[in-house]
Amino acid sequence: MRFSRFIIGLTSCIAFSVQAANVDEYITQLPAGANLALMVQKVGASAPAIDYHSQQMALPASTQKVITALAALIQLGPDFRFTTTLETKGNVENGVLKGDLVARFGADPTLKRQDIRNMVATLKKSGVTQIDGNVLIDTSIFASHDKAPGWPWNDMTQCFSAPPAAAIVDRNCFSVSLYSAPKPGDMAFIRVASYYPVTMFSQVRTLPRGSAEAQYCELDVVPGDLNRFTLTGCLPQRSEPLPLAFAVQDGASYAGAILKDELKQAGITWSGTLLRQTQVNEPGTVVASKQSAPLHDLLKIMLKKSDNMIADTVFRMIGHARFNVPGTWRAGSDAVRQILRQQAGVDIGNTIIADGSGLSRHNLIAPATMMQVLQYIAQHDNELNFISMLPLAGYDGSLQYRAGLHQAGVDGKVSAKTGSLQGVYNLAGFITTASGQRMAFVQYLSGYAVEPADQRNRRIPLVRFESRLYKDIYQNN
């Protein structure tokens, strides 16, 4: 009996040694200095098929969205909807609303200006033509900063990093056109569509075509209060305008200006002022409302397209719903940790969760922890309907054109979430092997860097690495 146990143990050691040797061969495809933590395990199995630094902490990047989605489904449920309302505690007399109009924003990441227009139209149809009171922008569902700890400061004005505020309209992103001046040395000028309630100032100097100075004189944007932006730097002369897009920094101010304009366009006047309401108040009578699509539909978009805005509003909403407090980053983090431990049996230990999207550089997680999450998802997928929300290699989302997986011949066989930051290329999800087995895998690859001269072909080593790795996983399990 002891001898048989010794043989089994020896066989396991040999297997793991072979695994490590094989993984080391894959790593030779990567740029020098790259760090890999990898874990592959059959769904329902007690031991991994590949365990390579699975306890090593790493930046999850957008694989964090897998955790956010699971916690959201458990806490909020697949049918949850974000709700935006127009409310009042006043009465309507002869077309005059005697009291304040409250626009209660519920952090709907999909709310559009047209939705606000429709709600105002409903208000008008109810007989209101004048408001004898103030217009309040209620953002009390969230509190504290709208930007998570650890977000790179230079990404703050990019639309993919738009602050997930309580008040969001058209993803809190706006577009402008930058025109070079006819004469070199003069300031370029900016055109902003009138329906964007923002102010842009140009301090951009126009350079002659082909100017050597353009290489190091870059465009930059400096945000100010109340969605005022200053564009600085240089722009070589060009015949066509340069299209640019920026993230709104003050969601409440932006939404308030849009509501103010829509009331004006509808012919509804008011005697008071536009104010922000941040303290929780008793709701009034709802006169108009807009609901988002069901949560499951939003999570599918979030996972397929790696939508940061949805991820972070959902994350903050989880904290709000779990603890009945305004949604903050800390509340979201504590709620996710508690939900996974108490309702999914997943103890994430010393994992650091700073946001829901994975944009924060403060996030840290080990592949072994993410593997626990994936195993729970796979074993409860009948009720969660989760795996179908993940990008499918070769077909949709962020895996549609993943060259390494295509070369590995696993199009349609891999459902996984991608995660990319500077020097980070992650994957976490599932592969159906040639024998029909479903295996979960976590690939955390960081420290990926190439020489400046090789930037154009920087992904070639990644393609080689992933094509060999996933081809072997597919064929040999």
PLM features: residue spans?
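Bacterial N-terminal signal peptides that target proteins for export
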Residues: 1-7
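Bacterial N-terminal signal peptides
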Residues: 7-15
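Beta-lactamase-like hydrolase cores
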Residues: 18-57, 83, 117-126
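Conserved serine DD-peptidase/penicillin-binding transpeptidase domain
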Residues: 22-27, 75-348, 468, 472-476
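Generic beta-strand/beta-sheet core signal
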Residues: 41, 232, 273, 354, ...
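Small-residue-rich helix-loop
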Residues: 49-51, 112, 315-477
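Short active-site loop at a secondary-structure junction
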Residues: 51-71
